[in-house]
UniProtKB/Swiss-Prot annotation:
<protein>
    <recommendedName>
        <fullName>Nucleoid-associated protein LBUL_1514</fullName>
    </recommendedName>
</protein>
<dbReference type="GO" id="GO:0003677">
    <property type="term" value="F:DNA binding"/>
</dbReference>
<keyword id="KW-0963">Cytoplasm</keyword>
<comment type="similarity">
    <text>Belongs to the YbaB/EbfC family.</text>
</comment>
<comment type="subunit">
    <text>Homodimer.</text>
</comment>
<dbReference type="Pfam" id="PF02575">
    <property type="entry name" value="YbaB_DNA_bd"/>
</dbReference>
<keyword id="KW-0238">DNA-binding</keyword>
<comment type="function">
    <text>Binds to DNA and alters its conformation. May be involved in regulation of gene expression, nucleoid organization and DNA protection.</text>
</comment>
<dbReference type="InterPro" id="IPR004401">
    <property type="entry name" value="YbaB/EbfC"/>
</dbReference>
<dbReference type="InterPro" id="IPR036894">
    <property type="entry name" value="YbaB-like_sf"/>
</dbReference>
<dbReference type="GO" id="GO:0005829">
    <property type="term" value="C:cytosol"/>
</dbReference>
<dbReference type="GO" id="GO:0043590">
    <property type="term" value="C:bacterial nucleoid"/>
</dbReference>
Length: 109
């Protein structure tokens, strides 16, 4: 009997080797993701008038608002500052995730 041919373009790997490699890759990605979830990410708006701090799993950990940011005559301004700080914090998480996990997903899409 002839030896089963390896998958073309896979560097001569057989199915068992590919599965082993995929499992290793999955474990590395899980470790990277866990590392991100333990980090904190901060979004700031208008010279730190509003500061939103998140954990890497996108949980809002704290929201700091300077008293001078609270103007009873202009609640829309405070809303805008909170939205800006929150969006900046979430964007930092997205960027860190892309940077960390992007090396594994590059070429898959």
């Amino acid at each position: 009997m002839s030896k089963r041919p390896a998958f073309p373009g896979m560097g001569g790997m057989n199915m068992q080797q590919m599965m082993k490699q995929a499992k290793k890759l999955q474990e590395q990605m899980a470790k990277e993701q866990e590392n991100i979830t333990t980090q904190e990410f901060t979004g700031k708006a208008a010279d730190d008038m509003v500061v939103a701090t998140f954990t890497g799993d996108r949980t809002l950990k704290s929201l700091f608002i300077k008293p001078e940011a609270i103007d009873p005559d202009d609640p829309d301004m405070l809303e805008d500052l909170v939205i800006d700080a929150v969006n900046k914090g979430l964007k930092q998480i997205d960027q860190a995730t892309q940077q960390s996990l992007g090396k594994y997903t590059k070429g898959l899409m």
